[in-house]
Amino acid sequence: MKKRNLLAGEATDTVLRSDMQIVIPDDATVLCRRSAGRLAQALTLDGLEPAIVTGQDATARQTVRMTLGNGGMTYRVTADGAGNCNLTAGCDRALQQAVLELCGKVKNGRLPQISAVEGNAESLLRVMYYNVYGYGNLDSVPDRLGQQAALIADAAPDVLCVQEFDRLHRAGAKPLLEKAGYSEVPVTEDGGFLYPAGKNCEAIFYRADRLELLRSGGEPYPDRVEVDGAEVIGNNSNTKSTAWAIFRERTGGKIFLAVNTHFMWSAPELTGKQANAVRVDNARRMVVLIDAIRALDPAYANLAVIFGGDLNCGADSDPCAVVKTVLTPVYDMADTERDNIGYYGVYATYDETTGQYRYGEIPCEGGGIDHVFAAGLTVRNYLADTCFRARITSDHLPKTVDLILN
């Protein structure tokens, strides 16, 4: 029986398809892993598919090796003629473009012999929403900062929207972010980063080399909210707030609005009905805020918007329905890669001994309370990061959105 070459267009006497591997970096991002899966699916035929392995586990004679470089949007694909292919890209978004191009060349589960392919991927902006705190022992937060900083560095978002960014994160994580080239968005009229109460748990950071900050602001949610004629708690020690920023691309000059928020949770002082009513109030305030920002300047009238955070409610909830009156869930907009993964379980199990969340299975689709919505832009990818670092450092998973401004 003839053995078939996975990459060559003709039958050869080399190796069985199942002996072929797609090799990804040991610290591959979620988009890199998804791209490898897309290529493996395209190369699958007759129930056989190439294995996806990390560099240290590569053993096959035929490989497609994926390498991420220095953050640029270029990519290059080369083949050695013996069934091996190398994909080198500046970042995971460029790698995705190379994989999509390769998938277009696959016929009958095989990739024909190719000459070198290179190009520039479309310039995607990446926005990450990430609740970094997680409940548990406060003293353990500094131990988790390095893992979270590495996770953020791997994803390399252009805009980072963090929730529950408390004093310990400000002391430990903010210097790491600044060292990596991020600047924080001011939220007060005098250019400060903290509200008068001394907190700003919903901070926005951005890459100043890629984006210019035009305007920004923010405010905590009210301490008390009226529900059915009675005032109930509307905040938790000033930890629930909103920050916003208008950015202009340094290349291209297009502008957009990024909004980061954290809606009220189901505090013990509230009934389920009351907590829902407070979150509906939060959502209505967001709709008013977006309209008010667009009214600041005629140039902002049709401003593209990305809005999200920890909304403490499901996708089909009343608060999300309010947001959907003006914005669309990015899950519905993503046209290339997407998932609907929330945090794992009702809450991750926190281990007081280690100060981390117990390593568990990769979360399933649905069940999330972190949501992202948008308008006036194109969404390529919407993915939750389910890597090991993400699963041990918070009870929420980072959500990344890759977008193009229209």
Regions found by a protein language model. Give the residues of each.
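Structured beta-strand-rich core segments of catalytic domains in phosphoester-bond hydrolases
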Residues: E164-F263
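Acidic, contiguous N-terminal accessory segments
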Residues: M1-G119
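Active-site environment of divalent metal-dependent phosphoester hydrolases
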Residues: G134-G136, R167-A171, W265-E269, N312-D318, ...
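Active-site-proximal beta-strand elements of phosphoester/diester hydrolases
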Residues: N86, L124-N137, R215-E219, I255-W265
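Acidic/histidine-rich helix-loop elements
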Residues: Y129-G146, F193-L194, P222-N236, M264-V278
